Amino acid sequence: MKRTVSALTVAFLALGGVTATSAAGHAEEAVLIPGATVFKEINPLYPLVALTYPVIGINFHDDPHPQLVEYSQNALDADRALREGVARAQRVVDKIDGPVVVIGESMGSVVASRLARKLADSAEPPSKDDIRFVLIAPPEAGVAKWFTVGTFIPLLNYRVSRVPESPYHTTIVIGEYDFWADPPDRPWNLISLANAVMGAAFVHGPPISATNPANVPKANTTTTTNSAGGTVVTHFVPTPQLPLTQVFRLIGVPDKIVDQADRILRPIVDAGYRRHDKPGDTRPYLANGGIHRNVQGQQQARDGAQASVSKKAADTPKRRKRLRDRVERSLREPTTRVAERRAERRKGPLSAESKSGASEQPQ
């Protein structure tokens, strides 16, 4: 199997010009778990899709002969495929003597994350130094969040779950606008939804699998520690050109025209994602099987309104007091002096100078 995968890797790199670089910093064996497909045995496109498997996470390991986990990959019988994938991946990992990196893409990332949890719960769990995981385009960190945990989707024979936490170092790679890993929070924004659906074709799969972490902006990389004590590094990979308009580029529409369309459409697309919301934005969004609003934003809006009302309420007595003081001072002063002040205000500086000049004339 290693020899076959290695040959495919060489062929793919020769055609695509992808360069493998080491992200591990030390020698380790790589185990690759591909994503879902349908009718694998009779699908005429499957052999072409399989040619891309060697590129899965190619910039996250330096193994020249990665092992490929073979399982059903059946998207229409997901739970069974996932169980089979975990069992087969574990057998591959158990045979490796030394450090290993398990890299899963799409459905393969679900297999990898469940394997990590299973190994951590085993009687003799591997050391943190001996194994790490890379999850590329994980749907359980994306579209699955539309639904509550435990929701059963009959069409896919899949029960919704989240990415399980483990003590092992885990890298997550998410491509912007990828429907499976980065769907809009407001799917009723049809332009945003259509863009994400196109992202399933133009971002998901080989494009995101070939991500080089060195090219991801530092601001788009976060590091956290989960409840199991594992370090989780997340790379959010920007998509410079909207997937929604990629078809026009492919059919030969000049980039200048499509770029202009992108500039018009991107704010509409981004309005479907909470990450672009401004403070105080209370627009609804879909999460965990229900419609929610930004409670913090609502509270900020309420606090701001209350502060404005309080300020006005506090200013009103002050204004009234200043007015009363002014009236009282006017009443205490001689009437003639008040008249003079009023005259000075009406006539302005010139009248004051004229008055001064008149007082200096000899009597």
Tell me what each language-model feature is.
Residues L13-T19:
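Hydrophobic core
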